[in-house]
């Protein structure tokens, strides 16, 4: 049962991160198309957002391994 729970946690975390990253990059590209002079500021904000989104699947993997080894 723990194996299935771990797979679900890691899989849904990766799915959510992929969707979130896609939305962040989409917004950044649209913003750069509208205001090219803000390219560097938008890129910096995009990388911060991607870092925050990617933190959740990493935590999910850690929780999954804790469930697996308990």
UniProtKB/Swiss-Prot annotation:
Function: F(1)F(0) ATP synthase produces ATP from ADP in the presence of a proton or sodium gradient. F-type ATPases consist of two structural domains, F(1) containing the extramembraneous catalytic core and F(0) containing the membrane proton channel, linked together by a central stalk and a peripheral stalk. During catalysis, ATP synthesis in the catalytic domain of F(1) is coupled via a rotary mechanism of the central stalk subunits to proton translocation.
UniProt-annotated location(s): Cell membrane
Annotated InterPro entries: ATP_synth_csu_bac/chlpt, ATP_synth_F0_csu, ATP_synth_F0_csu_DDCD_BS, ATP_synth_F0_csu_sf, ATPase_proteolipid_c-like_dom, F/V-ATP_Csub_sf
Membrane disposition: Multi-pass membrane protein
Transmembrane segments: 4-24, 47-67
Keyword list, A-Z: ATP synthesis, Cell membrane, CF(0), Hydrogen ion transport, Ion transport, Lipid-binding, Membrane, Transmembrane, Transmembrane helix, Transport
Complexes and interactors: F-type ATPases have 2 components, F(1) - the catalytic core - and F(0) - the membrane proton channel. F(1) has five subunits: alpha(3), beta(3), gamma(1), delta(1), epsilon(1). F(0) has three main subunits: a(1), b(2) and c(10-14). The alpha and beta chains form an alternating ring which encloses part of the gamma chain. F(1) is attached to F(0) by a central stalk formed by the gamma and epsilon chains, while a peripheral stalk is formed by the delta and b chains.
Molecular function terms, GO-annotated: lipid binding; proton-transporting ATP synthase activity, rotational mechanism
Family: Belongs to the ATPase C chain family.
Entry protein name: ATP synthase subunit c
Site feature: Reversibly protonated during proton transport: 54
Annotated Gene Ontology cellular component terms: plasma membrane; proton-transporting ATP synthase complex; proton-transporting two-sector ATPase complex, proton-transporting domain
Species name: Exiguobacterium sibiricum (strain DSM 17290 / CCUG 55495 / CIP 109462 / JCM 13490 / 255-15)
Superkingdom as given in the UniProt entry: Bacteria
NCBIfam families per UniProt: ATP_synt_c, PRK06876.1
């Amino acid at each position: 049962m723990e194996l299935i729970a771990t797979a679900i946690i890691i899989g849904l975390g990766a799915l959510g991160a992929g969707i979130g990253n896609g939305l962040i990059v989409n917004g950044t590209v649209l913003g750069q198309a509208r205001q090219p002079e803000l390219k560097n500021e938008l890129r910096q904000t995009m990388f911060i957002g991607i870092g925050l989104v990617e933190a959740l699947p990493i935590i999910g993997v850690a929780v999954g391994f804790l469930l697996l080894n308990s």
